[in-house]
Swiss-Prot record:
Residues 354-365 have a biased composition (Polar residues). It comes from Arabidopsis thaliana. Residues 56-93, 176-260, 350-370 are annotated as: Disordered. It is found in: Nucleus. Residues 68-93, 186-219 have a biased composition (Low complexity). Residues 253-302 form the bHLH domain. Keywords: DNA-binding, Nucleus, Transcription, Transcription regulation. PROSITE patterns: BHLH. This is Transcription factor bHLH68. Homodimer.
């Protein structure tokens, strides 16, 4: 009896759990499965992983702890209904060479539980497939946004999936269904995979953002350098232009004071030329060249007059007289004929030359006199004055009556 109590304890626990698959045993009816296209309703809080998916699915040997022996089960099987038509259970019984009559109600209940779990696994496979499609769609969007981010996230997601598959294979080999990739009824498993993949995607995005930030910072550095470089280039260009300007000869720009002095000098020069024109030829040509030529001729005439008047004081020999005459003859061409008052008669010049020669001879015969150059033109010979006065008649050199010698 104690074994019967022990055998019925898991059945009571399963009945208390409220599994809807018990409809298979009681009436052969089961609730309608949810639609394949819709998402599965959230599991109740009592359907935890410890209660649903940590139980043995298909044990290779008869259940030594939960299933009674054929001798003890015959008493309890009399009150149980007939074995339902379960192909999976019948195939398992045939493979283990056990008669169907030797199973009790607990075994039938376990068979129904396994059938319900298989259907739930199929539903969860569909749900997982739908989640994977959504996840792949999200990855496709990320792939369109950033190809590098998608590659990194896909690699990490594939690595996580491989790890999960390996864990699922190990758990299936041990006989437990914990976290297979095709059956994710465990919300914690699904959330861990999705969160790990999303976290990996976020990490990749953050890393890529960091890389982008680094590149932007790098570009910022270049841009800042570029912002600093245009003044440098302009300064270089300015320096080159300054260097080129220094290589060129700068123009000598006169100061305003020098310009004013030049203007003043020009005005003064023009005024002086006008005054010279009034002295030389007031009724002649007014251009600068003609005024200068007339002024030059007039100056030469004055020089010849001065030499003729100062000749008795300088010439002492005949050779000097000859040179003086030649010089006077050469200067006659420069005398202006249009000024008759300034001309000297040739005869007067000849007489002056003869008198000067006679006086020179007398001076040579007499004692040498002192040179009168230091005294200037204060003394004039009487012979020269008489000749000039007798020839012209209007000369102011006329001597006084009864005077002889020097004034």
């Amino acid at each position: 009896m104690n074994r019967g109590v022990l055998e019925s304890s898991p059945v009571q626990q399963l009945m208390a759990a409220g599994n809807p698959n018990w409809w298979n045993v009681s009436g052969g009816m089961r609730p309608p499965p949810p639609l394949m296209g819709h998402q599965q309703a959230p599991l109740p809080p009592h359907m935890t992983p410890n209660n649903n998916y940590l139980r043995p699915r298909m044990m290779p040997t008869p259940f030594p702890h939960f299933l009674p022996s054929p001798a003890t089960s015959s008493s309890s099987s009399s009150s149980s209904p007939s074995l339902p038509n379960n192909p999976n259970l019948s195939s398992w019984l045939e493979s283990n060479d056990l008669p169907p009559e030797s199973w009790s109600l607990s075994q039938l209940l376990l068979g129904g539980l396994m059938m319900g779990e298989e259907e739930r696994l199929e539903m969860m496979n569909h749900h997982n497939h739908h989640d994977e499609q959504q996840h792949h769609g999200f990855q496709g969007k990320i792939r369109l946004e950033n190809w590098e981010e998608q590659v990194l996230s896909h690699q990490q997601a594939s690595m996580v999936a491989v790890d999960i598959k390996q864990e699922g294979n190990i758990n299936n080999n041990n006989g437990y269904v914990i976290s297979s990739p095709n059956s994710p009824p465990n919300k914690s498993c699904v959330t861990t995979t999705t969160t790990t993949s999303l976290n990996s995607n976020d990490d990749n995005i953050n890393n890529n953002n960091n890389m982008l930030d680094f590149s932007s910072n790098h570009n910022g550095l270049h841009l800042s350098e570029g912002r600093h470089t245009p003044p440098d280039r302009s300064s270089e260009c300015n320096s080159l232009e300054i260097g080129g300007s220094t290589n060129k000869k700068p123009r000598l720009q006169p100061s305003p004071s020098s310009q004013s002095t030049l203007k003043v000098r020009k005005e003064k020069l023009g005024g002086r030329i006008a005054a010279l024109h009034q002295l030389v030829s007031p009724f002649g040509k007014t251009d600068t060249a003609s005024v200068l030529s007339e002024a030059i001729g007039y100056i030469r005439f004055l020089q010849s007059q001065i030499e003729a008047l100062s000749h008795p004081y300088f010439g002492t020999t005949a050779s000097g007289n000859m040179r003086h005459q030649q010089h006077l003859q050469g200067d006659r061409s420069c005398i202006f004929p249009e000024d008759p008052g300034q001309l000297v008669n040739d005869q007067c010049m000849k007489r002056r030359g003869a008198s000067s020669s006679s006086t020179d001879n007398q001076n040579a015969s007499e004692e040498p006199k002192k040179d009168l150059r230091s005294r200037g033109l204060c003394l004039v010979p009487i012979s020269c004055t008489l000749q000039v006065g007798s020839d012209n008649g209007a000369d102011y050199w006329a001597p006084a009556l009864g005077s002889a010698g020097f004034h």
